[in-house]
A protein has these predicted regions:
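Gly/Ser/Thr-enriched, mixed-charge loops and adjacent short helices
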Residues: 1-4, 17, 107-232
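Proline/glycine-rich low-complexity loops and linkers
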Residues: 81, 125-157, 161, 252-324, ...
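Phosphate-binding and adjacent anionic-ligand microenvironments
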Residues: 275-463
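N-terminal small/polar loop signature for handling phosphorylated ligands or for N-terminal nucleophile
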Residues: 32, 36-37, 43-107, 160, ...
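An N-terminal, well-structured beta->alpha segment
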Residues: 1-68, 93, 145-175
Length: 463
């Protein structure tokens, strides 16, 4: 890449405020760059429910067609469906128009390789080099643009083949589902219907303004889902982000759990049943509970930098079937090594339906809250701070590294500061938004609160 040019790619693709930093000129040139990078087709293009997504899809497809490459139009689909198509339906790559959990004014482009995973960090640099040098491939012929209506049906059938459908149907689960006005409205309700679930939906219509709640599901903005679970006596609730690759779960009592805790429960289930001794790949900001669960089953946890691309690519390198992030992104490699909210929901249903067969569960059906409570007890805290510049964000990381007398420091990504063997604070600049993110864990709730307050004061004094 040419020197002094700013990075286009963040943690997950290229994103920005549409019409501001994410301009039509950028979209056109980036599309030419991707056409040049892929070199041949067909390429599958899909988009989420944001207001600007349909027109951006038309632009991207037209530009790639003009480079002589055939393009399949997936239409409005969750990101995992687009990635599934790129991997399994004969495409040479894929492009998803999405800004995932970002606010409505954002949009973005996420390229996927033909292995179904976002292109690697090295390939991102290759695309950026093409973009800045303007070395675009040209063609005298125009590629074909066609609609692929097989993707969602094929995807759902594949998910069903990976879980015990009969056992799940026998339980007649009631599930409260907050779709968040996002792309999972095209898949999740239909998948759960085939699994025999009674579904109660919230924010089920697609709306790019995300009027029901923010496009990022968090325990703070899922109070309506929590109440719906309790009022409807549902077995659990699930909420998806804007493009449907992440999911947060609410237990039958209305408590919303962070993604890595439910993820740890799924991991324990998989390690004890389908994938004994398997490696688990996750970012460095993931819960300590995961390592403790893996230790129970003589398994191993591999840590990466933060970002689903980092986790997915490491899963491919190590041939691992299990990966996850703390934000509700769970990856099941038997389908694809990417985050997938619908696949995760199916795994939770299977975990609950088969819990009575686990010796550790005393041969009784268990609720989600009982399964979560049986995990190692960890207190968690997560927040983010608005940060005006990347320089200030980087300075905050440095200041935190130099603060106090920690037991150990890890700098794989940002600063992970170990107060003692069972307590840590992590600070890192967001790769998708103008924030500094803070994560903290401890087995001691009082110590956690004290250290969180200490580091909050330190960070807020520098912003």
């Amino acid at each position: 890449m040419q020197k002094n040019n700013p990075r286009l790619f963040g943690t997950n693709g290229v994103r920005g405020v549409f019409g501001k930093e994410f301009t039509l000129d950028l979209v056109v040139d980036l599309s030419y760059s991707l056409a040049t990078f892929f070199g041949k087709g067909p390429i599958i293009v899909g988009y989420d429910g944001r207001n600007s997504s349909p027109i951006l899809s038309k632009i991207v497809r037209s530009v790639i067609n003009s480079a002589g490459i055939d393009v399949g139009n997936a239409g409005l689909v969750p990101t995992p469906c687009l990635q599934y198509a790129a991997k399994r339906l004969g495409y040479n790559g894929g492009i998803m128009i999405t800004a995932s959990h970002n606010p409505p004014e954002y949009n973005g482009i996420k390229p996927t390789a033909n292995d179904g995973v976002e292109i690697s960090r090295e390939d991102e640099l290759k695309v950026e080099d093409i973009y800045y040098s303007k070395r675009f491939s040209k063609s005298d012929s125009f590629g074909r643009d066609f609609t692929d209506e097989t993707i969602i049906g094929s995807y759902i059938e594949k998910v069903l083949s990976l879980v015990n459908v009969e056992k799940i149907r026998q339980r007649n689960f009631r599930v409260a589902m907050d779709i968040g006005n996002g792309a999972q409205s095209r898949v999740a309700p239909f998948l759960l219907n085939k699994l025999g679930c009674k579904i109660i939906t919230l924010n089920g219509n697609i709306d790019g303004d995300f009027p029901g709640r923010g496009s990022e599901p968090t325990p703070e903005n899922l109070k309506m889902l929590s109440n719906m679970v309790k009022d409807s006596k549902a077995d659990f609730g699930v909420a998806y982000d804007g493009d449907g690759d992440r999911s947060l779960f609410c237990d039958e009592g209305g408590t919303v759990h962070w993604g890595d805790m439910v993820g740890a429960a799924i991991v324990r289930y998989l390690l004890k049943t389908k994938h004994k001794g398997a490696e688990v790949v996750c970012p460095i900001n993931t819960t300590m509970a995961l390592s403790l669960v893996a230790k129970e089953t003589d398994s191993k946890v591999i840590h990466t930098k933060v970002g689903s691309v980092e986790v997915s690519r490491e899963m491919l390198r190590r041939k691992s079937f299990i990966g996850l992030e703390e934000n509700g992104g769970f990856m099941y490699g038997k389908l694809n090594e990417v985050r997938d909210g619908a696949m995760t929901t199916a795994l939770v249903l299977e975990m609950l339906s088969l819990s009575d067969n686990d010796d550790d569960h005393n041969n009784k059906e268990q609720t989600l809250s009982q399964i979560i409570s049986s995990l190692p007890k960890i207190f968690q805290y997560k927040t983010k701070f608005k940060c005006p510049t990347k320089q200030i964000a980087n300075n905050i990381v440095t200041i935190c590294l130099e603060h106090g007398s920690p037991k150990k420091i890890e700098t794989l990504d940002g600063a992970k500061i170990w107060i003692d063997e069972d307590t840590w604070i992590m600070v890192r600049p967001s790769g998708t938004e103008p924030f500094v993110r803070m994560y903290a864990e401890s087995v001691d709730g009082s110590l956690l609160n004290s250290k969180v307050a200490e580091y909050r004061r330190l960070i807020e004094s520098r912003i």
